[in-house]
Amino acid sequence: MLNDISICMLTLDNIKEKVYFEYRRAQMEAMKTERLGVIHVSDVIKPCMRNVVYNKITPHTMSTEDMKSLYFGQIVHSNSMIAKPENNEMFLAYNYVKDEPLTREEALKIPAEDPEHLDIIYGSIDDLIEIDGKWIICDKKTTGSIDYFGRYNSKPSESHVDQINRYRVLLKKCYDIDATFGCVIYISNKIEKDKRDIPIPMAFKLKPIEETLADMIEKSRIIKDAMTECTLPERTKCYLCDGMCPFASTCFEDNRKKWKE
């Protein structure tokens, strides 16, 4: 009798709500990835170090639209291996103070709160492939603007080019492999029945390692000082300021020297 009552109490709305939140939970689980350290390649490609520091000291929140984009990207990355297994998702960790690489095992042994992490730049290469004796660093990017990249005269995003140039530096430091070309593969995150699904690879030559390394170290030192001394780097007028920085309204009025007294 009690079982009959409990079945009667279960409504279609109850089921829909339960399934909805279970799906959202599954999305969150799928987006979890191992992320060691403090300073990452995604930090040292930014034009504004204040943006980077705000991002590290501010609690992270995410809208469902942000989740959708990240979730789709994670699914694509985990199910589209372009390179051989040993050259897919290549771990990168470089101590720029000691000029030494670290293996994943060595990095994992460093406690999360150890300040040594501030001496290390971390990253991960999607795929490294070899064509006619030349190494090419490939990076997959999902986008809602596939039509833009599909134009005959389009170029890859500058930030994506900068990212792969930094991967070149870490690849040489960590594996002694010198890649001279990069390729961003743009993949549409939209499903449109009236359009063909066409991934768009965009290849380019990479910059000299020394030039890129100097910029990486300079930015890493700014981040290290900011996190160690609790200081705020100078704001930098750049493309992020207008509509692309979630901290803009804070930054415009924030004249503090320190983010923590």
Language model regions located:
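Residue-level preference for long, well-ordered alpha-helices that form the structural scaffold
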Residues: 117, 156-160, 205-212
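Metal-dependent nuclease catalytic cores in nucleic-acid-processing enzymes
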Residues: 78-84, 131, 153-186
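Metal-dependent nuclease catalytic regions and adjoining charged, substrate-binding loops involved
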Residues: 4, 10-14, 104-112, 169-261
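Short helix/strand-bridging catalytic loops that position acidic/His residues to coordinate divalent metals
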Residues: 146-158, 203
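Soluble or luminal CAZymes and related metallo-dependent hydrolases
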Residues: 68-76, 159-163, 215
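Short coil/turn motifs at secondary-structure junctions
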Residues: 132, 143-145, 187-191
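Metal-dependent nuclease catalytic cores that hydrolyze phosphodiester bonds in DNA/RNA
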Residues: 1-136, 144, 150
